From Swiss-Prot:
Protein name: Cytochrome P450 90A3
A cellular component annotation (GO) from this entry: membrane
Induction: Down-regulated by brassinolide (BL).
Transmembrane region(s): 2-22
Species this chain originates from: Oryza sativa subsp. japonica (Rice)
Gene3D superfamilies, per database record: Cytochrome P450 (1.10.630.10)
Family affiliation: Belongs to the cytochrome P450 family.
Keywords per UniProt: Brassinosteroid biosynthesis, Heme, Iron, Lipid biosynthesis, Lipid metabolism, Membrane, Metal-binding, Monooxygenase, Oxidoreductase, Steroid biosynthesis, Transmembrane, Transmembrane helix
CDD domains, alphabetized: CYP90-like
Main location: membrane
Topological type in the membrane: Single-pass membrane protein
């Protein structure tokens, strides 16, 4: 019996391997090989090893502080648009800003958003990142309604209060891991915007599970992963259930409250401003959003609000620390604002608009740090670009990083130089030509990009006017599975005044 079972298992495994090899061989020709014949000239490149392609080479490069060689070497051999094979399928990589611009603008027509199956499963099919067409348009519009108004006085006051509340937990002379502290701020802010829950045991428990979920984004989602909880992907799947479950409980309770109130939310039926995103969803389109849609949507906004903004905060401090002249100029700008307002007055929109050098620092941090390395798209139709045809169904990766760090577009591109943004036409030209695309572009332009700038600006204001700091040890950046520092960027803090109230 045991021998027969083993033989059966071996046969099944052999069939799976043969099927995977055949799939890989078919990918060499691709879906357009028969359809287009000789006209289907794919961008040049290499599919790497059978089954795994060049995935291990890409991961190996992006787990270092200098992942550029992976793309640079292939661009040198094949040009700005080349073919590789990563994460289980053939993928066209673009380091060409003109082609990237085409891809961003063609969302919903020639291409659609497409990400590795691990991300799709963990975020949910109804998430903002993965929905398409009319569904994406309505979610994007709702996000803009809630997060695209950073000038709102209540929101500014809440950001200011939350940043200071986190800093009050730091000892007058403390060592903190800045990346972790920044993530607490952005996570708590996002949770507040989503479900109106203040920081506490519930939010911290949710955050711990959420970190496990994020770790699984670029892991290999093999079929039995859900049965193997010791794997990164298995742990991420379990964490996803817990995070979704916690959000679902809040949403269910709010739906019940709405039903008890005869279809209205709360006592003040005439109020113009919704208190959070769940309320926006419950009221939108006559309450047509399902429970699962709301769960997936809220979970995806946690990703957008948590990982990217917190890394922007961390990298801004890291790059400023490594560039003393920039730090000195930033301190002067914020000291002037503090002196005009008084230390205990919360920041207002007019103060934010009085931070021009801060915006230069944020732009340069986005350009050099490349928190979002690029975006995945899938061709809805055959795409003809220059002498190449990218067939329908092919995965495409538009690399923002390759463009941002190209000396053809930025002088000494790999040097942190915030002063380059003080020349207004430089910024306008870069943005207008889609050479500077840290928040994407086209219909999928990040709806919370201005809010992210406001959060980082307020954080930097309170940090530089209340603390001095120094790195406790050398820490380096890596870019897989997400952009982060290996040690969380530990720094020694020293309070500059007696109180940070």
């Amino acid at each position: 019996m045991a021998a027969a079972a083993l033989l059966l298992l071996a046969a099944a495994a052999a069939i799976v391997v043969v099927a995977m090899v055949l799939r890989w061989l078919l990918l060499l020709g691709g879906p357009a090989a028969g359809r287009l014949g000789k006209r289907a000239l794919m961008p040049p490149g290499s599919t790497g090893l059978p089954l795994i392609g060049e995935t291990l080479r890409l991961i190996s490069a992006y787990k270092t502080p200098n992942p550029e060689p992976f793309i640079d070497e292939r661009v040198a051999r094949h040009g700005g648009v080349f073919t590789t094979h990563v994460f289980g399928e053939r993928t066209v990589f673009s380091a060409d800003p003109a082609f990237n611009r085409l891809l961003l603008a063609a969302e919903g027509r020639a291409v659609h958003s497409s990400y590795p199956s691990s991300i799709a499963t963990l975020l949910g099919a109804r998430s903002l990142l993965l929905t398409r067409g009319a569904a994406h348009k309505r979610l994007h519009s709702l996000t803009l309604t809630r997060l695209g108004r950073p000038a709102s006085p209540p929101l500014l006051a809440h950001i200011d209060r939350l940043v200071l509340a986190t800093m009050r937990q730091w000892e007058p002379a403390a060592t903190v891991r800045l990346m972790d502290e920044a993530k607490k701020i952005t996570f708590n802010l996002t949770v507040k915007q989503l479900v109106s829950i203040e920081p506490g045991p519930w939010t911290e428990s949710l955050r711990r599970e959420y970190v496990k979920l994020i770790d699984g984004f670029f892991s290999i989602p093999f079929p039995l992963a859900n049965l193997l909880p010791f794997t990164t992907y298995g742990q991420a799947l379990k964490a996803r259930k817990k995070v979704a479950g916690a959000l679902r409980e809040v949403i269910k309770k709010r739906m019940e409250e709405k039903a008890e109130n005869g279809g209205s939310i709360g006592d003040d039926e005439g109020k113009k401003e919704k208190k959070d995103m769940v309320e926006e969803l419950l009221e939108a389109e006559g309450g047509s959003f399902s429970e699962e849609e709301m769960v997936d949507f809220c979970l995806s906004l946690l990703v957008a609000g948590y990982e990217t903004t917190s890394m922007l905060m961390t990298l801004a401090v890291k790059f400023l620390t490594e560039t003393p002249a920039a730090l000195a100029e930033l301190k002067e700008e914020h000291a002037n604002i503090r002196d005009m307002k008084g230390k205990k007055q919360p920041l207002e929109w007019s103060d934010y608009k009085s931070m021009p050098f801060t915006q230069c620092v944020i732009n340069e941090t986005l350009r050099v740090g490349n928190i979002i390395s690029g975006v995945f798209r899938r061709a809805n139709t055959d795409i003809h670009y220059k002498d190449y045809t990218i067939p329908k169904g092919c995965k495409i990766f538009a690399s923002f990083r390759a463009v941002h760090l190209n000396n053809e577009h930025y002088e000494n591109a790999r040097t942190f130089n915030p002063w380059r943004w003080q020349i207004n036409n430089k910024l306008q030209n870069a943005v207008g030509a889609n050479i500077f695309t840290p928040f994407g572009g086209g219909p999928r332009l990040c709806p919370g990009y201005e809010l992210a700038r406001v959060v980082v600006s307020i954080f930097l204001h309170h940090l530089v006017t209340r603390f001095s700091w120094e790195e406790t040890e050398e820490d380096r950046l890596v870019f897989f599975p997400t952009t982060r520092t290996l040690k969380g960027y530990p720094i020694n803090l020293r309070l500059l005044s007696e109180s940070i109230c």
